[in-house]
UniProtKB/Swiss-Prot annotation:
Involved in the maturation of [NiFe] hydrogenases. Required for nickel insertion into the metal center of the hydrogenase. One of its GO terms (biological process) is protein maturation. Keywords: Metal-binding, Nickel, Zinc. It holds the Pfam family HypA. GO terms for molecular function: nickel cation binding; zinc ion binding. Zn(2+) binds at residues 73, 76, 89, 92. Ni(2+) binds at residue 2. This is Hydrogenase maturation factor HypA. PANTHER family: HYDROGENASE MATURATION FACTOR HYPA. InterPro entries: HypA/HybF.
Length: 113
């Protein structure tokens, strides 16, 4: 379950931000996660609760904003929106697609004290 490692990295990023911005508590974390990022949201929520225990983000609300995926279609030479990684091109039905959006996870913002 790599979501635990993701949560540990998230905690490290929050601790660095706390030092740089001089805050001591995180009450809410908003993450943008692409559909193709390979993150299982429920596993992430579980990991978040476990990893944040005893930290500056213990009890913080985790808000997940799911971002659509997109891909470049080699057949019609268009960037198209996709709901899942194995979908065919919605414009031409082609299957030669390379994901180019919705593959990452970003911290959108933190609510802090």
């Amino acid at each position: 379950m790599h979501e635990m490692a993701v949560c540990e990295s998230l905690l490290s990023a929050m601790e660095e931000a706390a030092k740089a911005q001089n805050f001591s508590r995180v009450t809410r974390v908003r993450l943008a996660i692409g559909r193709f990022a390979g993150i299982e949201v429920e596993a992430l929520r579980f990991g978040f609760d476990v990893v944040m225990r005893g930290s500056l983000a213990e009890g913080a609300e985790l808000v997940v904003l799911e971002e659509d995926g997109s891909a470049w279609c080699f057949d019609c030479c268009e960037t198209v929106a996709l709901s899942h990684r194995l979908a065919s091109c919605p414009k031409c039905g082609g299957e030669r697609l390379v994901p180019n959006g919705g593959t990452d996870m970003k911290i959108k913002d933190l609510e802090v004290l």
